[in-house]
């Protein structure tokens, strides 16, 4: 690990030239093991200790360059037992090593960027909930919104060409290109495109996808800055690109035969907000739908002519924000008009003034969440709680703690909901499912189990916030109504709950 850190501190001119030899360094695969693999796949095979993993990688790369990588000599009986039956396994070994190596230039640029801009490292910026305060602040003033599915069926050569701007090591790029064409179907099958963000996908391909999105967003932000009256503020990292302006100028001239700056000035846009999440993006704008249509065809032409990805304009729908709901990150968000009546009196005349204000509202979509609970065997498809099968040696405390952990995690994640009715229903399903599971284990009725457990069992399912507030405030109608509409966004949530990740 220390050797890896020393390598990161080398001069930038040397960093690009010596990535290929890192494939044969032991600590690279130890680092990949710590971040990616669940087990030490190299040490589990007989005859291979930790010190021989670099030898294994050398043989893997040699066989990969051969016409048939699974043809071995008669003296390689032990190796044949390892390689011949584990093609997926050793392709994963190399992919994990590749992932660590190609991330080095990105990590170095990120560190230098943060140091140059004097940006303090903050874990709060990584929270999923940090996006919702931004939406509350901005979206209530906008008029039109469009949800766009970012295409990711990109040709392998496009992915390699994207990395050429970051990795200057020709040997590494050549080996990466050969590896992708050889083992693409082995590592990612067509069915896995649907669950691209699942935990089981190889780290290398998640990195390639993120670099592909970085390429797309760098061009998109460039066009956004050039076509806006205001300077845009972004939380992303914007790096210099080779011949970047020349590429953009050529890209625009494909559609327009005029001066580049004049074209962009014609499309000046006062308000345009962009949000990306889970392979999707949201575009929101103020004023007329003409601006949204302009950016719609900008994106379509960008994907088709720059990334050679077929993108249908009809799949991008432009909707009025006041009559449209956004489903993302486990929430259903919308902008609603809240009317309030204000009584004003002037001399002897009394006036009633009706004020309508836009408010950003977030609720928990109950139907998809019940579908996730049904798949996890907490309830049926109608939302009726059922007993969950458990191991015979599981204790009551283990079962209760498991249900409590799930319930509190969901409450913590959905704490920003403006209406808690759906969340209360989910808590009811989990609480009654826990009761039925324990009653089934002891072979008694639910009524008998609740009599034996008492009220202490139900109080365990209260979250810490509910317990504190119930002690501070009396149980009145106004207090319960206040708790029902209370919103809290936590900045320590860095991953989506498995039950929420139904998209």
From Swiss-Prot:
One of its GO terms (molecular function) is RNA binding. GO terms for biological process: mRNA processing; RNA splicing; tRNA processing. It is found in: Plastid, Chloroplast. One of its GO terms (cellular component) is chloroplast. PANTHER family: MATURASE K. Usually encoded in the trnK tRNA gene intron. Probably assists in splicing its own and other chloroplast group II introns. This is Maturase K. It comes from Backhousia subargentea.
């Amino acid at each position: 690990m220390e050797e890896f850190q020393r390598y990161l501190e080398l001069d930038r001119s040397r960093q690009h030239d010596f990535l290929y030899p890192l494939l044969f360094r032991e600590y690279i695969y130890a680092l990949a093991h710590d971040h990616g693999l669940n087990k030490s796949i190299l040490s589990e095979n007989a005859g291979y200790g930790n010190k021989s993993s670099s030898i294994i990688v050398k043989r893997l790369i040699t066989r990969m360059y051969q016409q048939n990588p699974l043809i071995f000599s008669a003296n390689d009986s032990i190796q044949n037992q390892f390689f011949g039956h584990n093609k997926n396994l050793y392709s994963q070994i190399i992919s994990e090593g590749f992932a660590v190596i190609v991330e080095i230039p990105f990590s170095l640029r990120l560190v230098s960027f943060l140091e140059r801009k004097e940006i303090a490292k903050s874990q709060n910026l990584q929270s999923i909930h940090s996006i919702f305060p931004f939406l509350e602040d901005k979206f209530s003033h906008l008029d039109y919104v469009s949800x766009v599915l970012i295409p990711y069926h990109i040709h392998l050569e496009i992915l390699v060409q994207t990395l050429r701007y970051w990795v200057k090591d020709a040997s590494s790029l050549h080996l990466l290109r050969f590896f992708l064409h050889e083992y693409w179907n082995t590592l990612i099958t067509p069915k896995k495109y649907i669950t691209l963000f699942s935990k089981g996908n190889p780290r290398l391909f998640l990195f390639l996808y993120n670099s592909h999105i970085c390429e797309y967003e760098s061009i998109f932000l460039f066009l956004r800055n050039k076509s806006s009256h205001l300077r845009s503020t972004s939380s992303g990292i914007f790096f210099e690109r080779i011949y970047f302006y020349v590429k953009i100028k050529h890209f625009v001239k494909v559609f327009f035969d005029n001066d580049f700056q004049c074209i962009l000035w014609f499309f000046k846009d006062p308000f345009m907000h962009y949000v990306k999440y889970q392979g999707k993006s949201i575009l929101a704008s103020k004023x007329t739908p003409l601006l949204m249509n302009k950016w719609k065809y900008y994106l379509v032409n960008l994907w088709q002519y720059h990334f050679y990805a077929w993108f249908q304009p009809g799949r991008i729908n432009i909707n009025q924000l006041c009559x449209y709901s956004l489903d993302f990150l486990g929430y259903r968000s919308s902008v609603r008009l809240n009317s309030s009546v204000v009584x004003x009196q002037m001399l002897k005349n009394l006036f009633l003034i009706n004020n309508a204000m836009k408010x950003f509202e977030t609720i928990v979509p109950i139907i998809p969440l019940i579908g996730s609970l049904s798949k996890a065997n907490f309830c049926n498809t109608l939302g009726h709680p059922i007993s969950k099968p458990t191991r015979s040696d599981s204790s009551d405390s283990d079962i209760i703690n498991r249900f409590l952990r799930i319930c509190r995690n969901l409450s913590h994640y959905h704490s920003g909901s403006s209406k808690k009715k759906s969340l209360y229903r989910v808590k009811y399903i989990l609480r009654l499912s826990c009761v039925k599971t324990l009653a089934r284990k002891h072979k008694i009725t639910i009524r008998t189990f609740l009599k034996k457990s008492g009220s202490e069992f139900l109080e365990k399912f209260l979250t810490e916030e509910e317990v504190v507030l119930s002690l501070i405030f009396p149980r009145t109608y106004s207090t319960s109504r206040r708790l029902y509409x209370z919103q809290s966004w936590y900045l320590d949530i860095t991953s989506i709950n498995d039950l929420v990740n139904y998209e």
